[in-house]
C-alpha cells in the first residue's frame, strides 16, 4: 500500500491513499477492478499472465484441432481423410482396433525381466555354439535392431498422422511403444552377451542381405514422412496404402519370419533360451501388429474401393513377392549350411507359404501354389492365445513378463 508523502517543510502533501487510488484506476482498465483488488498480492509476472489469458480466443484456439467441432457420430468416422474431430475417442467405429489396444496393454513385458545368465555362459563357452549358430544369432540381432527402429519411425513420423481414426491411433501409439521395447530387447541381448555393439547396430550398412531389406523398406516411407505430405487425392491415398502394405505385410509380415524361426528353433533345443524367450514375446507382439495392419488395409479398401484397382493390386502383389525374395536371400546368407534342423531350402518353402498367406489376407491371388509349411510348430506358436506358453502349453504371467521355460 502506498504511503502518504510529505516534504519536511510542509510545502507539499499528498493525501493518504492517493497513489493506491491512481494505481487501481490504471490497472483496472486492463484486468478489471474486482480482479485487481482480489489479486493485490500477485507479482507483476502473474498479473501479466492473467491478463494474457483474459485475451485468449477459445474459438480460434480450438479451430487448430483436427476435424470439425461437432459431436462425432459413428458414421462420420473413416480410416483416412476423416473430417470428424479426431480427439473424440468414442463412440468407437472399429471395435477391433480398441480391443487390440487393450490386448497389447495386457501383454506388456520388459526385456530386463528375462534372465540371460544361461545365454551368457553359453555364448562365452568356445564350445557352446557352432560357428553357424553364432552367425544366426549375430545376423538376426543386427537386422532386428535396425528393423524395429525403421518400423517405429514410420509409425511416428507418418502413419499416425495420416490415419484419421482415434481408436486406430490409440493402437498405433501402443505399437510404437512396443517397437521401442523390441529395440530395447535387442540392445539388452547385445549388451548381455558383450557383443561388439558397433558391428551389430551398423550391420544394415555392412551386410548386403540386411542392407537390401532396410533400403527396400525405407523407399516406401520417404515420401509420406515428409511433414508436407497429405492424403486426399487418389495418388496420395495410394501412396499411403503402399506404405501400409510395405510395413505391415512385408516388413512385419515377411522380413521377420526367417529370424523368428531360427532363434525360436534354438530355444526349442535349449540354446540361447533368454534370447529365444524375448523373441517369442516379440513374435506375439508382431503378430498383433500384422493383424492390425491387415485390418486397416482392408478397411481402407472397403471405404475407398476406387483405390484398390488393378494397378494397385499388381503393385501390392509385386511388393509381397519382392519382399519374399529378399527374405529368401537373407535365409541363404544366414544359413549357408543346414543348422538347427532346418536349411535354406526349407526356409524358402516356409517363406513362400507365408507369402501366400499375406496375399490372401488382403484379397490377392496366391502366387506359390502347392507350398506347405515345413515348420508347423511356428503356426502353432503364432496361433496361441497371448497368455499361453508354446513350449509348456501352460498359462503364464505374460502380463508381467513372466519367464518362460524352454524345456
Set out the residue ranges of the language-model regions.
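Amphipathic alpha-helical packing elements
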Residues: 59-123
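Short, flexible helical or helix-coil boundary motifs
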Residues: 27, 34, 44-47, 53-56, ...
Amino acid at each position: 500500500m502506498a504511503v502518504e508523502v510529505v516534504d519536511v517543510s510542509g510545502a507539499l502533501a499528498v493525501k493518504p491513499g492517493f497513489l493506491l487510488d491512481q494505481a487501481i484506476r490504471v490497472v483496472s482498465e486492463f484486468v478489471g477492478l474486482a480482479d485487481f483488488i482480489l489479486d493485490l498480492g500477485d507479482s507483476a509476472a502473474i498479473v501479466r499472465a492473467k491478463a494474457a489469458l483474459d485475451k485468449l480466443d477459445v474459438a480460434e484456439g480450438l479451430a487448430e484441432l483436427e476435424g470439425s467441432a461437432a459431436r462425432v457420430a459413428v458414421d462420420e468416422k473413416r480410416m483416412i481423410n476423416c473430417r470428424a474431430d479426431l480427439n473424440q475417442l468414442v463412440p468407437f467405429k472399429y471395435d477391433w482396433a480398441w480391443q487390440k489396444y487393450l490386448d497389447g496393454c495386457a501383454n506388456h513385458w520388459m526385456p530386463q525381466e528375462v534372465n540371460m545368465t544361461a545365454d551368457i555362459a553359453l555364448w562365452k563357452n568356445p564350445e557352446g555354439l557352432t560357428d553357424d549358430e553364432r552367425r544366426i544369432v549375430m545376423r538376426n540381432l543386427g537386422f532386428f535392431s535396425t528393423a524395429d527402429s525403421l518400423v517405429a519411425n514410420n509409425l511416428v513420423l507418418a502413419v499416425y498422422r495420416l490415419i484419421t481414426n482415434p481408436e486406430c491411433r490409440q493402437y498405433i501409439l501402443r505399437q510404437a511403444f512396443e517397437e521401442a521395447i523390441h529395440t530395447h530387447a535387442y540392445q539388452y541381448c547385445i549388451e548381455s552377451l558383450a557383443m561388439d555393439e558397433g558391428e551389430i547396430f551398423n550391420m544394415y550398412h555392412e551386410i548386403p542381405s540386411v542392407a537390401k531389406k532396410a533400403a527396400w523398406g525405407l523407399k516406401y516411407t520417404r515420401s509420406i514422412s515428409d511433414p508436407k505430405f497429405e492424403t486426399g487425392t487418389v495418388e496420395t491415398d495410394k501412396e499411403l496404402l503402399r506404405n501400409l502394405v510395405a510395413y505391415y505385410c512385408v516388413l512385419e509380415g515377411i522380413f521377420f519370419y526367417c529370424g523368428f524361426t531360427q532363434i525360436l528353433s534354438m530355444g526349442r533345443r535349449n540354446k540361447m533360451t533368454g534370447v529365444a524367450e524375448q523373441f517369442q514375446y516379440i513374435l506375439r507382439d508382431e503378430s498383433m501388429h500384422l493383424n492390425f495392419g491387415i485390418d486397416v488395409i482392408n478397411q481402407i479398401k472397403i471405404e475407398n474401393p476406387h483405390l484398390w484397382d488393378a494397378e494397385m493390386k499388381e503393385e501390392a502383389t509385386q511388393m509381397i513377392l519382392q519382399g519374399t525374395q529378399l527374405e529368401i536371400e537373407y535365409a541363404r546368407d544366414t544359413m549357408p549350411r543346414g543348422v538347427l534342423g532346418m536349411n535354406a531350402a526349407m526356409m524358402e518353402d516356409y517363406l513362400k507359404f507365408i507369402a501366400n498367406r499375406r496375399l490372401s489376407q488382403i484379397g490377392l491371388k496366391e502366387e506359390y501354389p502347392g507350398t506347405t509349411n515345413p515348420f508347423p510348430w511356428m503356426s502353432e506358436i503364432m496361433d496361441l492365445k497371448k497368455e499361453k506358453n508354446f513350449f509348456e502349453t501352460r498359462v503364464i504371467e505374460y502380463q508381467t513378463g513372466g519367464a518362460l521355460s524352454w524345456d
